[in-house]
Design a protein with these regions (language model features):
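Mature-chain termini and adjacent capping regions
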Residues: 1-115
Length: 115
C-alpha cells in the first residue's frame, strides 16, 4: 500500500512554529523578522532557527539562530551574522539588537566593508 510510503515521507519537526514572522516597530521604521522554525522559550522569548532574516527599508541581517524577545523588541544571536546596507557590509560572530532596532552591536570576529 501507499500509506507506508507516505508515512516514511512525513518529517517530524520539534519546532513550535513553522515559518514564524514577527516585526520590531519603532518611530522611524519596521524591521520584519522571518525564520524557518521557532521554539517558545517562555511567554516572550522565542528561539528562531534556520535561515533567520531581519529586513527593513535600510538594511538586512541574516543568521542561523536568534533569541527574539517580543515584549522588549530585542534580538540576540551568537551565530555567524551577515549585515548588509546600501554602503556597508558586516560579517560578525553575532549581534545584539535593542532600543527597538535603533541600535545593533556586532561582536566577535567582525569584518567591515564600507563603500
Amino acid at each position: 500500500m501507499h500509506i507506508k510510503q507516505d508515512i516514511k515521507k512525513i518529517r517530524v519537526s520539534n519546532a513550535d512554529i513553522e515559518h514564524p514572522k514577527f516585526a520590531i516597530k519603532n518611530q522611524s521604521k519596521q524591521i520584519y523578522i522571518t525564520a524557518k522554525e521557532g521554539n517558545f522559550l517562555d511567554k516572550n522569548k522565542i528561539l528562531l532557527n534556520k535561515n533567520v532574516k531581519f529586513k527593513s527599508n535600510d538594511f538586512s541581517i541574516e543568521t542561523e539562530t536568534v533569541i527574539f524577545n517580543r515584549n522588549e523588541q530585542t534580538a540576540k544571536s551568537n551565530t555567524k551574522t551577515y549585515f548588509s546596507a546600501e554602503n556597508t557590509r558586516i560579517s560578525s560572530d553575532g549581534f545584539d539588537m535593542f532600543d527597538k532596532g535603533n541600535k545593533i552591536f556586532f561582536y566577535g570576529n567582525a569584518f567591515v566593508v564600507l563603500k
